[in-house]
Amino acid sequence: MSQGRSRGKAKGVEEFRPYVTRALPVGARVTCADNSGAKVLEIIMVQKAKTRVSRLPAAAVGDYVNVVVKKGPAELRKQVHGAVIIRQKYPVRRLNGVRVAFEDNAAVLTTPEGEMKGTDIKGPVAAEASEKWPRLANLASMVV
């Protein structure tokens, strides 16, 4: 019979992740910061979002979301894609007390495994997103 133990990690020990305010609700439009061809994305679903009844799920930096391309080439429009949020306007408080806010809300198109559909990221990437998605950090020109 099973002992109820988890494999790999010690029981009760989990990786610490600081809280990031969720500032991008479902329906928010964000700019696409990669070279896939898409210009504007609309968030239609936040993966693994736990929320209250009747409250819109919202995303923060580093979250994986389902999006629809609103402006871009015809082959990308009218279908659901995955994306990772890399910047948000609302300030993110770091553990050292610094608050970081960006000029725009931005995301990059990705697969569920974390592989980017484009080959380049325009602008900076938040450190919270690069820690959670290491493949994005490899392509980022600047991590803030």
Swiss-Prot record:
One of its GO terms (cellular component) is cytosolic large ribosomal subunit. Keywords: Ribonucleoprotein, Ribosomal protein, RNA-binding, rRNA-binding. GO terms for biological process: translation. InterPro entries: Ribosomal_uL14, Ribosomal_uL14_CS, Ribosomal_uL14_sf. It holds the Pfam family Ribosomal_L14. One of its GO terms (molecular function) is structural constituent of ribosome. HAMAP family: Ribosomal_uL14. Part of the 50S ribosomal subunit. Forms a cluster with proteins L3 and L24e, part of which may contact the 16S rRNA in 2 intersubunit bridges. Binds to 23S rRNA. Forms part of two intersubunit bridges in the 70S ribosome. Belongs to the universal ribosomal protein uL14 family. This is Large ribosomal subunit protein uL14. The gene is rpl14.
